[in-house]
Regions:
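Short beta-strand scaffold positions
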Residues: 55-56, 122, 142-143
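Active-site-proximal alpha-helix that buttresses catalytic centers in soluble enzyme cores
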Residues: 2, 7-72, 115
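Phosphate-handling substructures
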Residues: 14, 28-29, 70-124, 186
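A generic secondary-structure signal
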Residues: 43-44, 126-130
Length: 196
């Protein structure tokens, strides 16, 4: 891979209600606004040569990618390592309640039945490495806010923070291969010795 284009999915039924969903088995399609955002993403990407589209296991992500790439012959690959976090006891609940809980915790603390942030970062890094090893030149990754935010900040040299800024729906971040290697090194170093 030479170029990675990253885009968050469009607004979903859960995100519109500020609810968390880390279980890909739970149906969570896009809202009408999310479908419009996905089509707008397609217009943004219209002039891009895309050799492969990577998605997660989540319906909202696949739907966004399919709408954005409608009419184009682009193969898809599922990268489950880039799924949203497993929220455990917070699954299906308020995003604000989860954020309030998680911000006060260290990177090795997890909600019951969920993942801690060092696990999440390690999983994401493995997923990004899978993409980096792909033979295709340009890969579009449609994913979730958190993996994109971690990679975006790491590309600027910043390790994960206890509270990450949300990534806007259906916008594009471009990272060249030479930007990805140091960004992944930042994430791997943090995951090996996590601290906020």
């Amino acid at each position: 891979m030479k170029l990675l284009l990253l885009a968050r999915h469009g607004e979903s039924e859960y995100s519109a209600k500020q609810l968390v969903n880390g279980d890909p088995g739970v149906s969570c399609p896009l809202t009408e606004a999310g479908r419009l955002q996905a089509r707008a993403l397609g217009r943004i990407l219209a002039d891009e040569q895309i050799d492969l589209c990577a998605v997660t296991e989540f319906e909202r992500v696949r739907e966004t990618a399919q709408l954005a790439l409608a009419g184009r012959d682009v193969p898809f690959v599922v990268v489950p390592e880039l799924n949203d976090p497993r929220y455990g006891e917070f699954e299906g609940g308020s995003l604000d309640v989860y954020r309030e809980w998680i911000v006060g915790r260290g990177p090795l603390e997890a909600p019951a039945g969920g993942e801690h942030r060092a696990e999440i970062v390690s999983r994401y890094t493995a997923g990004f490495r899978r993409l980096l090893d792909r033979p295709e030149g340009t890969v579009l990754l449609v994913a979730h806010s958190l993996p994109i935010a971690y990679l975006r900040d790491a590309a600027a040299g910043a390790p994960p923070r206890s509270k990450m800024d949300q990534v806007d729906y259906a916008t594009v971040l471009r990272l060249e291969r030479q930007d990805l290697e140091p960004a992944l090194a930042v994430l791997e170093a943090w995951a090996a010795s996590p601290a906020f």
